[in-house]
Amino acid sequence: MRTAALLLPFALAASFTSAPLLAAPASPAHATAPQSQLRLQTFHPGPQAMFSVSSVLIEGRHDAILVDAQFGASDARRLVDLIRASGKQLTTIYISHGDPDYYFGLATLQDAFPKARIVATAQTVAHIQQTQAGKLAYWGPKMGSDAPKRLVMPQVLEGGALQLEGERLPLIGLDGPTPDRSVLWVPSLRAIVGGIPVVAGEHVWMADTQTPKSHADWLQTLQRLQALKPKVVVPGHYAPGAALDASALRFTADYIRAFDAEAAKAQDSAALVRAMRARYPTLAGVESLELSAKVAKGEMRWP
């Protein structure tokens, strides 16, 4: 396996965060290993965004792959600017999950890069097909001019990996208990990218996983990701300033266990929210916690 040291300089702009994760020369201990030619840039729309969803540009020498397309059209346009500034040819847009904050920006990306293929796993495509009309009806009026002018359906990705300039980038989790919750693995950078299983710096969205088995499966997925010993982890959702490393895996697993423990003791959602905020007083995304707590305590149905 190719290895590379990673440098993580973060540049905060007024409207978004672009975090280049640069592949540096291999350390002397691995001097004979081929050096990775890949480089990551992350895009985050900033704290003012409706959803803190990330996008990642995986760059080779000449070509690039984009992971996830943003939610609002204005953020997607800023993402277009980042891609163009890279000077690389965008060959592929990969959508890592079927919720609208991952793909509503596709029309903007497709207009800017019409030759790029747009793909997702069969599970993600099925999720989008089943939910896109309802999601647009709900979110469209709230988004106003930021709403997508059309919805773009990804093609089903054949096989379990992407390819970039001869390097295979496998999807991890397709053969696990929850194939709809996979992530992309960049072996030469030891980087986990995209998907919904991992969160950093904000309350974890628990409303979509409502059974003990779903939480056990989730923890199993996180354990599998930890076994990869990643150097970089770019979650599908993270708060600006969060560490993009393996600590996100530990945080997510600890949060799931804490939520389960507090939900079992709490009399109602308000008590559950208080308990989780006491455990995690600095996390962003309290609105997500409040809704998740209501679902967990049977006070509302979701979706």
Language-model features, listed with the residues they occupy:
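Conserved beta-strand hairpin/beta-sheet module of binuclear metal-dependent hydrolase folds
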Residues: 34-85, 183-196
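Active-site metal-binding motif and surrounding structural segment of the metallo-beta-lactamase
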Residues: 74-119
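Positively charged n-region of N-terminal signal peptides that target proteins for export
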Residues: 1-5
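Metallo-beta-lactamase
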Residues: 71-72, 126-250, ...
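Bacterial N-terminal signal peptides
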Residues: 7-20
